[in-house]
Amino acid sequence: MDLGHVGIEFGCRRQAINPGTEPIEVWLQHLAVVPHQHFPRVIGHAQGFYLGEYNAPHMSTRSIAITDDITFGGDHPPLFIAGPCVIESREHALRMARTLLALRDELKINLVFKSSFDKANRTSVESFRGPGIEEGLDILRAVKEETGLPLLSDIHEWQQAERAAEVLDILQIPAFLCRQTDLVAAAARTGKAVGVKKGQFLSPEEAKNILDKGHEVGNDRVYITERGSSFGYQNLVVDMRAFPILRGFGAPVVYDITHSMQKPGGEGKQTGGTPQFARPLARAAAAAGADGFFMEVHDNPPAALSDRTTQIRPEAAREIISDILALRAALPPL
C-alpha cells in the first residue's frame, strides 16, 4: 500500500488512483480499493476479512449536546469528565464537586462531574461497591443542585436506565458491558447522551456496531470512550490509531486517561496501575484527535475506596487539562 502516491501495489502490478477523480473500484486478485477523499478504503473479499479503513485527513465529527450549554465534538471545545471513581459518601462527593467546579471556572472549560453509584465490576467480592442506585442518585442530585455541574454515572442493567436518566446528563455503559445490546438500547432510548466504554477486548473498528445500536433506536447522541486494550495478562496499552479510526465513524471520541493506566488484577484482589503515564498519554491522545477526556480525580488517592492506584489528585488534573488546552490551541484540527 502506497498512501503517499494514493495507489495500490499488489505483486508486480500497480494501479494508481488520482486524487480528484470520481470514485472508482479497482479489483486486484479479490482485493477492492474504493477511493474516499484521497485515501482508499480497503476491504478483503475472498476470505471475507477486514483489512482496515484509511480515513481522509480533516475528518470532522458531528457534535453531541450534553446540556443546553455544553456541546462537544466537531469544532467545539474539548469536554472534560472528572470526579472520584465511586461515591464514597455524600460529604466526599460534594467536596470533590466543589473542587472541580473551582477548576472548571479557573481554566474556563466544559466539565461534567462523574462518580459511580455502584461499581458492579470490582475485582473482588470484598471490594467496596458504592451506595447503590437510590442513595447514589440522591447524592448526585445534591451535587447538581449545589454546583450546577452536569452529571455522568454508570448503569449496569437495562432496568436502571430510566431511573438514572431522571438525574444524569450522560449515561455511561461500562467497558465489560459494551456489547450488551439491551443495555445500550435502553440507555439510548432515554434520549440522554450515552457514553460507551470500548471494551478492552474490542478493536476500534468493532466499536461502530455499538454506535449503530444507539442509532437504531433513534439516538444519535452516542459516543465511544477509548480506555485501552488488553496486552497480555494484567496490562493495557492505548493504540493512538484508535482515535482517528473511531472519529471516522462520525461521533466524537473520549479518552479515559486514568482507567487506561490500570494493571487489571495486578494486586491480587485489587487493580494496580501506573499513573505516572497519565500525563504523557493524555498529551498523545490530544494530538491524535480525542474530543473529550475522562479522568478520575480524588483528593487522597492512596485512601480511595476504589482504583486507588490510578486516580489522580486535583493538581495533577489541572496540569493535564492545561496540557490538553495548549496542544489543542497549537495544533490544526485533524
Protein language model features and the residues they cover:
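Short linear motifs in low-complexity or flexible loops
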Residues: 7-8, 16-21, 31-35, 40, ...
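Catalytic beta/alpha-barrel core
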Residues: 131-132, 149-157, 169-182, 193-204, ...
